[in-house]
C-alpha cells in the first residue's frame, strides 16, 4: 500500500481565513490577488502575506527524512490535477497525507452540486476512484473542518503531530494553488520540489 504526501503551498499561510473572504475564484489568480489587496486596503485591513517559517521547517524535515525513497515527485498547479498523478502511479487504496490549509473533501451542502471534480472536492473523487482509502489532513491551527460527506478524515494541526511519526512516502505531490498562495510565493512549490529531489 502506497503512502502519498500531498503538499499544497497554501498550507504555509496562516492568515488564510482573513484574506480568503476577499477572494474571487471566478477571476484569474493574479486578478483575484489584486482584488484581495484592494478590498483589504479599502477596509483598512493590513494583511500578512508571508509563509510561516516554522511550518516550512517542519515540512523540510519531512522531505529530508521521509521522502528519501520517493519514486515520483510531481509538481501541479491546482489540487484537482493530483487525480491524474495518482492514476499514473497506479495508486489503489493508498494512504493519503494531505498538508493543506483546506480540507478539500467537499464544501457543498447539496451532494447533487458536487458532481464535477474541482480543487475543492478532489479527495472525494480520489475515494470514489479507490485511489486512496485512509486520509489524514494536516492543517493550520485556524483551518476549519467543513466537509459534508461521511468520508472519515483524520485531521490535526501540524503543531500537534511530530514530523518523525509520518511514514516513509512513495509519492510526493506539490501543488502551487495560485488562488490561495500569494503570487510572490508561487515559486516556493518548485523550490521545495528541487529540495526534495536533492535529498539522498
Q: Where are the regions a protein language model picked out?
A:
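Conserved alpha-helical scaffold segments that buttress catalytic/binding sites
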Residues: 2-200
Amino acid at each position: 500500500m502506497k503512502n502519498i504526501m500531498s503538499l499544497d503551498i497554501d498550507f504555509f499561510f496562516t492568515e488564510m481565513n482573513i484574506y480568503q473572504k476577499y477572494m474571487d475564484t471566478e477571476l484569474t489568480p493574479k486578478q483575484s490577488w489584486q482584488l484581495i489587496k484592494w478590498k483589504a486596503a479599502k477596509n483598512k485591513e493590513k494583511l500578512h502575506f508571508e509563509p510561516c517559517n516554522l511550518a516550512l521547517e517542519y515540512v523540510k524535515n519531512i522531505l529530508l527524512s521521509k521522502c528519501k525513497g520517493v519514486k515520483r515527485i510531481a509538481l501541479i498547479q491546482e489540487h484537482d490535477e493530483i487525480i491524474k498523478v495518482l492514476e499514473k502511479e497506479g495508486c489503489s487504496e493508498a494512504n493519503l497525507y494531505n498538508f493543506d490549509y483546506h480540507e478539500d473533501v467537499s464544501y457543498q451542502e447539496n451532494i447533487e452540486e458536487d458532481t464535477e471534480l474541482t480543487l475543492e472536492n478532489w479527495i472525494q473523487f480520489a475515494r470514489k476512484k479507490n485511489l486512496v482509502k485512509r486520509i489524514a489532513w494536516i492543517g493550520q491551527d485556524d483551518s476549519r473542518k467543513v466537509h459534508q460527506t461521511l468520508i472519515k478524515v483524520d485531521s490535526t494541526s501540524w503543531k500537534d503531530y511530530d514530523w518523525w511519526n509520518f511514514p516513509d512516502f512513495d509519492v510526493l505531490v506539490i501543488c502551487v494553488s495560485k488562488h490561495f498562495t500569494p503570487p510572490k510565493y508561487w515559486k516556493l512549490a518548485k523550490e521545495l520540489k528541487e529540495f526534495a529531489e536533492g535529498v539522498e
